[in-house]
């Protein structure tokens, strides 16, 4: 929600844009997917600390050294690439693969649905 992101970053702090949304909207059965080239952005660290404290599930996509995100995500998908463009392309491909997996999983179960 771009309006919510603008409001939080302008009125509170850009460092809190993801954490405040996770606090309000995440449930125990949710999985938060985090994407960061360095893995060290303060807003990524803040939401990851919150999720780990609340035992919420996280998947981190990172590049370069992976940083905090690679070390503290429940599942870390790290591409040791030192180029932003290539790293972002790899993350896009991995996200497409993940979304295809989720979409196919939705077709084969009567359990809770994953909403895309």
Model regions and ranges:
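Catalytic core of pol beta-like nucleotidyltransferases
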Residues: 116
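Glycine-rich phosphate-binding loops that contact phosphosugars or nucleotide phosphates
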Residues: 1-113
């Amino acid at each position: 929600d771009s309006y919510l992101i603008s409001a939080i970053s302008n009125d509170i702090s850009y460092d809190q844009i993801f954490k405040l949304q996770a606090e309000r909207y995440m449930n125990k059965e949710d999985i938060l997917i985090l994407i960061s080239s360095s893995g060290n952005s303060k807003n990524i660290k803040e939401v990851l600390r919150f999720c780990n404290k609340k035992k919420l599930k996280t998947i981190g996509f990172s590049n370069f050294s992976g940083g905090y995100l690679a070390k503290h995500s429940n599942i870390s998908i790290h591409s040791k690439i030192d180029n932003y463009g290539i790293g972002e392309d790899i993350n896009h491909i991995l996200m497409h693969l993940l979304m295809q997996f989720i979409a196919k999983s939705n077709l084969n179960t009567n359990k809770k649905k994953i909403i895309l």
